[in-house]
UniProtKB/Swiss-Prot annotation:
Protein name: GTPase Obg
Lineage: Bacteria, Bacillati, Bacillota, Bacilli, Lactobacillales
Top-level taxon of the source organism: Bacteria
Record bears the keyword Acyltransferase: no
Family (UniProt): Belongs to the TRAFAC class OBG-HflX-like GTPase superfamily. OBG GTPase family.
Organism per entry: Streptococcus thermophilus (strain ATCC BAA-250 / LMG 18311)
EC number assigned by the record: 3.6.5.-
């Protein structure tokens, strides 16, 4: 049996765009050939793709870094560099992708074949053929390729099941799953026999089918991490109907009704929205002594805690071991599923706001100025830093162009306002230059 892994932290890095080329056309009979340097190719993106054949995040246990290839450099004769192929990373259905730094949900991937770009490849730098103007017909300017997007991601697998079996350990959840589906969960007469979720397909006599998950047993304090804690509570979130399994024989000395209240409390504490899901109470082990009396007492306590006009949850007495009462339970479950819509897993506050990768917010200041300990001025900011890394600092014309761009952004004026003097050191990353007033 393969090891079950339902969380992983990984890093992804898209490819850098290829550098543009500085070249000139030098051919016989072609005087003043002009610029001929082509653009660099686009860097490869990192794309997640859902593969329904995968069931866990085990592939990410040892392989935690994913890096796409860089685009090729531009070439002479105005030829563009080849764009790099995208890196396709397969993930199981039901995977939620979060930004590890902010915790925001980037995407929730559930459909087979669904794709999502988690890191965009950098744009290729422009060659000098792009910078020719009537005033400068032979520019020695070309851009470096844009760096690819890089980010840390948190992956969470929440299995795709229509129905979830919940309850205390050893109440018979795994036995129910093994009887009504072809799944073969581990079954034993001790607590926490089930330590990973098990999934099976149910088919009723009337022809209805649905996916059922047996989740590891919950105990008091599970929502705070006691026992197996929240490690597997996340798998209940995608279910539409909850089958609340209770040991009606009270074989371990617990009160069945107190068990019922305690499990609901844990579900509510973990995620209030779990209590929106309809529940069917499964009174298991009805073939045991005192089960009938306990069920009668359970119903009385349940009714006493509901208002007169509230609808009581359905209760189905069964014996999974003796295969009694299961058909009625499954038919009722299928009927309830038909009446229940899917629940919204995340609201807008959970989701990361989608942004245009190459765009900039007009309202945001394109740069920031700070003072270092050595009295030098430090320039930072996404737009400014992107212009810097795409500037070829080995060519004078490119440096002059970058200086004009800084002036156009208002950097010179802002430095003067902050008190910068002629000859002061200004730093962008590891690059230093003198401020000229």
């Amino acid at each position: 049996m393969s090891m079950f892994l339902d969380t992983a932290k990984i890093s992804v890095q898209a490819g850098r765009g290829g550098d543009g080329m500085v070249a000139f056309r030098r051919e016989k009979y072609v005087p003043n050939g002009g610029p001929w340097g082509g653009d660099g190719g686009k860097g490869g993106s990192v794309i997640f793709k859902v593969d329904e054949g995968l069931r866990t995040l085990m592939d990410f246990r040892y392989n935690r870094k994913f890096k796409a290839k860089n685009g090729e450099k531009g070439m002479t004769k105005g030829m563009h560099g080849r764009g790099a192929e995208d890196l396709i990373v397969s993930i199981p259905p039901g995977t939620t992708v979060r930004d590890a730094e902010t915790g925001k949900v980037i995407t929730d991937m559930v459909e087979d074949g669904q794709e999502f770009v988690v890191a965009h490849g950098g744009r290729g730098g422009r060659g000098n053929i792009r910078f020719a103007t009537p005033r400068n017909p032979a520019p020695e300017i070309a851009e470096n390729g844009e760096p690819g997007e890089e980010r840390e991601l948190q992956l969470e697998l929440k299995i795709l099941a229509d129905v979830g079996l919940v309850g205390f350990p050893s109440v018979g959840k795994s036995t129910i799953l093994s009887v009504v589906t072809a799944a073969k969960p581990k079954i034993g007469a001790y607590h926490f026999t089930t330590i990973v979720p098990n999934l099976g397909m149910v088919r009723t006599k009337s022809g209805e089918s649905f996916a059922m998950a047996d989740l590891p047993g919950l105990i008091e304090g599970a929502s705070q991490g006691v026992g197996l804690g929240t490690q597997f509570l996340r798998h209940i979130e995608r279910t539409r109907v909850i089958l609340h399994v209770i040991d009606m024989s009270a074989s371990e000395g617990r009160d069945p009704y107190e068990d019922y209240l305690q499990i609901n409390k844990e579900l509510e504490t973990y995620n209030l929205r779990l209590m929106e899901r309809p529940q069917i109470i499964v009174a298991n082990k009805m073939d045991m002594p005192e089960a009938e009396e306990n069920l009668k007492e359970f119903k009385e306590k349940l009714a006493a805690n509901y208002d007169e006009f509230d609808e009581l949850p359905q209760i189905f007495p069964i014996s999974s071991l003796a295969h009694q009462g299961l058909e009625n339970l499954l038919e009722a479950t299928a009927e309830l599923l038909d009446q229940t819509d899917e629940f919204l897993l995340y609201n807008e506050d959970d989701m990361e706001q989608e942004e245009v990768y190459y765009g900039f917010n007009e309202e945001e200041r394109p740069f920031e100025i700070s003072r270092d300990d050595d009295a030098s001025w430090v320039l930072s900011g996404e737009k400014l830093e992107k212009l810097f890394v795409m500037t070829n600092m080995e060519r004078d014309e490119s440096i002059m162009k970058f200086a004009r761009q800084l002036r156009g952004m208002g950097v010179d004026e802002a430095l003067r306002e902050r008190g910068a003097k002629d000859g002061d050191i200004v730093r962008i990353g590891n690059f230093e230059f003198e401020f000229v007033d």
